[in-house]
Curated annotation (Swiss-Prot):
Cross-referenced HAMAP family: Hydroxylam_reduct
Known EC number: 1.7.99.1
Chemical reaction(s) catalysed: A + NH4(+) + H2O = hydroxylamine + AH2 + H(+)
Species, as recorded: Trichormus variabilis (strain ATCC 29413 / PCC 7937)
Residues reported in the UniProt entry to bind [4Fe-4S] cluster: 3, 6, 15, 21
SUPFAM superfamilies: Prismane protein-like (SSF56821)
Cofactor(s) of this protein: [4Fe-4S] cluster; hybrid [4Fe-2O-2S] cluster
Protein name: Hydroxylamine reductase
Record-listed hybrid [4Fe-2O-2S] cluster binding positions: 244, 268, 313, 400, 428, 453, 487, 489
Pfam families reported for this sequence: Prismane
Molecular functions (GO terms): 4 iron, 4 sulfur cluster binding; hydroxylamine reductase activity; metal ion binding; peroxidase activity
Record PTM Cysteine persulfide, positions in chain: 400
CDD domains: HCP (cd01914)
């Protein structure tokens, strides 16, 4: 087993025996086998596109399958065997369509590959392909490092593109890019600079994917508005929806209407409360329960209702509560019931069987919904506060949360940020400090929750708008970005910021294990990318 795509990789190096996320060596091998089959499918898809053939099914499948290989999404060997078979079926179907046009299929070893019919042999094929991919770059570990960065970033882009296509937002250039990267991942004629340029293009494409998702979310659910969200609970039957999928949450809300069941969000679905067409249309969307993904084992155990897991981040469930957890979309785990977004009757049945909350709890609240439209709507107030010296500096403190030590840096940092500074946050990293009362500056809250990790798009739009107003570039704004990372979507977001030329980003709690010292040096020299140190030291530099 070789997996170093997340921040929690064993000993900060690579997972060899078992994934720190709970992924088995068998699933790891089948994920590598799936990616190999997708590479062959992409080669054929590109030829099909060049002939004007329709490839939308393949495009969408490629996005969803890359998404399924993200950290904490799918742990099911049977699912990945099914995915591999589907990839081959789509590939062969496209080949027949190409031949029907009178053209010969451009054959290669990758697009002629056939998976074994036996599960154990497929697992061995995956292990062999993993070793072959590593061996191809053995002579240049820096190129291998950038290849991994490219692939992991692409997985993050695929996650956002998948959510966007669910909302009927598509972009052909995005699909072509997926196929081009996968089809040429084994290229041996590219320099280190070539691979760096391609990696930064992942950032460019991720900006497009986040833009599509932003359009899909706002057109479907309205622009987020500042909304107070209760963190407590109320008496009654309950369903908890975790993950990131707003469309799945909408389906749960629609199908539970009139049942008396209250729906609660968990993890990165907290920002859902800010979308008018979710909150205002569905009054039984009651509040938010729990915190970030890594706390789910004890939070899910205590929740007295049914739980729906959408997209990532699923942890291996404990036996004590796995019978009330349901998976949806690309999420999978052996022994958990998988449901369709169109029929959640099993979830409703389970929620009605379980006791639900038997008493009301204390109603502490937080506020979410400060996306780009809300913030830019009060831009004049913000600008005047900066000009008058009431706001000295902005800090974007966000990203992924995680379980490894060192992440208390972010809560300590926010506590120490001076009172004349505003904190923007997004992603599940905010759960380190989301319930702190930081007060306001002239009516502007000092803590602004922009939304989910993909709402980095909002942060970018806000920064660009402020830069245009002050007639400077983004790097000249009184703005510091201090980010936490865990998985592949965070990699994609970081690559977007680097593609945009944003300098002096601080990341933590550790550097990605897949970055070699030379690649770290290259990124540091080019973009002044740096690792966090201590809250005191970093604040002194940012405000100096």
């Amino acid at each position: 087993m070789f997996c170093n795509q997340c921040e929690q990789t064993t000993r900060g190096d690579v997972c060899h025996q078992w994934g720190a996320c709970g992924k088995s060596p068998e699933v790891d091998a089948l994920q590598d086998l799936l990616v190999h089959c997708l590479r062959g499918l992409s080669q054929v898809a590109l030829q099909a596109k060049s002939l004007g053939l329709a490839t939308r099914e393949t495009d969408e499948f490629t996005c969803e399958m890359l998404f399924s290989t993200l950290t904490n999404v799918n742990f099911s060997t049977s699912d990945f065997i099914s995915f591999v078979n589907r990839a081959i079926a789509l590939r062969e179907s496209l080949k027949l369509q190409i031949q029907a046009t009178g053209n010969a299929v451009i054959q290669s070893a990758i697009n002629s590959f056939q998976p074994a019919s036996d599960t154990q042999k497929q697992i061995q094929q995956g292990k062999d392909l993993e070793f072959e991919f590593i061996s191809q770059s053995a002579k240049n570990v820096d190129i291998f490092s950038l290849k991994l960065t490219l692939l992991y970033g692409l997985k993050g882009v695929a996650a956002y593109a998948f959510h966007a296509l669910e909302l009927n937002q598509h972009d052909e250039s995005l699909y072509i890019f997926f196929h081009e990267v996968l089809a040429n991942l084994d290229a041996q004629d590219k320099s280190l600079q070539d691979w760096l340029d391609l990696t930064l293009k992942v950032g460019q494409m991720n900006l497009k994917a986040m833009e599509l998702l932003d359009a899909g979310n706002t057109e479907t659910f309205g622009h987020p508005t500042p909304t107070t969200v209760p963190l407590g609970h109320t008496v009654g039957k309950a369903i908890l929806v975790s993950g990131h999928d707003l469309l799945a949450l909408k389906a749960v809300l629609e199908q539970t209407s009139g049942t008396g069941i209250k729906v609660y969000t968990h993890g990165e679905l907290l920002p859902a409360h800010g979308y008018p067409k979710l909150k205002q249309t569905h009054p039984h969307l009651y509040g938010h329960y729990g915190t970030a993904w890594q706390n789910q084992t004890h939070e899910f155990e205590r929740f007295p209702g049914a739980i729906v897991m959408t997209t990532n981040c699923l942890m291996p469930p404990h036996e004590t509560y796995k019978d009330k957890v349901f998976t949806l979309g690309p999420v999978g785990y052996p022994g958990l019931q998988h449901i369709s977004i169109h029929d959640i009757s099993l979830v409703i049945q389970k929620a009605l069987e379980l006791p639900g909350f038997t008493e009301d709890s204390e109603q502490k609240t937080v506020t979410t919904g400060f996306a780009r439209n809300a913030v830019l709507g009060v831009a004049d107030t913000v600008i005047n506060a900066v000009k008058q010296g009431d706001i000295r500096h902005f800090f974007l403190v966000g990203g992924c949360d995680g379980a490894k030590p060192g992440r208390n840096y972010y809560s300590d940092l926010v506590e120490k940020i001076p009172n004349d500074c505003v904190v923007l946050t997004l992603g599940c990293g905010k759960f380190r400090f989301f319930d702190q009362n930081l007060g306001d500056i002239g009516g502007i809250p000092r803590l602004l929750d922009l939304g989910q990790c993909n709402d980095a798009y909002s942060a970018i739009q806000i920064a660009v708008a402020l830069a245009n107003t002050f007639e400077v570039n983004v790097n000249q704004l009184p703005l510091s970005m201090i980010l936490s990372w865990y998985e592949q979507k965070a990699i994609a977001v970081l690559l977007t910021l680097l593609y945009l030329g944003i300098q002096n980003i601080r990341i933590g709690p550790t550097l990605p294990a897949f970055l070699t010292p030379n690649v770290v040096k290259l990124l540091s020299e080019t973009f002044h990318l740096q690792l966090i140190t201590t809250p005191e030291q970093d604040l002194a530099v940012c405000l100096g």
